[in-house]
Every structure is written in C-alpha cells, then in structure tokens.
Amino acid sequence: LAFTGHKGLRGPQGTGGFLVSQELAEQMEPLISGGTGSVSHTEEIPNFMPDRFESGTPNLPGIYGLHEALLYLKTHSLQAINEKELSLTGYFLEQLQALDDTGRHIRIIGKKDLTDRNAVVSIQTPEIDMSQVAWQLDNEYGVMTRVGLHCAPNAHKTLGTYPAGTIRFSFGPENTKNELDFAIQGLKKILDL
C-alpha cells in the first residue's frame, strides 16, 4: 500500500510512504541508491528496513508535519470532517448553478449534486482562458485554485476536458460559506455574469 501524505492525510507535500510485508520487501529492489547514514562505510544499500528504501537525508520537517497531521486526524472525527467538506461542496455547486444555470459560461465537470462526489469541484470557462480566470481569482480575490490537467491527462481525455483541463476548487473543514461566496463573487465579476 503506497500513499501520499499531502492529500487526504493533510500532511506536507513531499511526504508519503508504503506498507509492505517483510517477505515482499526482501524481493523488491530499491529505485534509488545512495547513502543512508546507517551503513556509511559501504556503497551497498543496507538490506534492513527502513534504510533499504530510504536513501539520502530524510525529510525530517516533512515527517514531523505528517505526524502532526495524523495526530490531528486522530483527534477529529473523520465523519465530521467529511460532512463539513461535502456540505461546502454542495453549497458551492448550488451557487455555481445559480450563477450560470445555462452552463454556457461555466461548465461543471461531473455530477451537479453530491452523488459520488468528494470535496472537489472542477469547472471549465469556455469563453475565457481558464489560466486567466485562475490567475485573477488568486491575485484579485485571494482564491487559490488549481488549473490545467492536474497531472492526469488521461483522466481529462476520459472527461472530455483535454487538452484545456479545468479549474479545480477543493474544500477543507476550515473553509467557510463566506469564503465560497467570495469565490463565487469573483467568478461572477471575472466572467461578467
């Protein structure tokens, strides 16, 4: 099982890990070789865990940040976090549809309700370059989004959003409806709706 630390676990970018049985670990070859600090007198990668798969200087600030993120998740209800995020997502979808019920100016990617959704809403703005919209949201309204293909060009081909990609909004439990309203107002002004 391989995982990234910066998505659902809420840790810093550049963190992650994997769980593997001892038997499988002995069969696997490391992808990267180099010093580990534990067996410095040889150029060979150690055979023991975790050093076998951890070349170079460990990302201690990242590991500490991931640890703190896991402690946060341990002390907060995952169900409550999920409910808050989905509530915000539903609200944002409603506001987008109220802003442009024709879908001519804003194309919502995926279902327009919470069925099979997580706390992410991707849109396209067919009449205005999406990079420009994302730039204006950030620089004029302080609304951070992600624009483009999101490291997943094949997913965008499947969705019919390739090669332009989308503008992606994602919500966390710290976000508020007021912040979402601010993003909607920014879109309204930028798209001249």
Label the model's feature ranges.
Residues L1-L193:
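Pyridoxal 5′-phosphate
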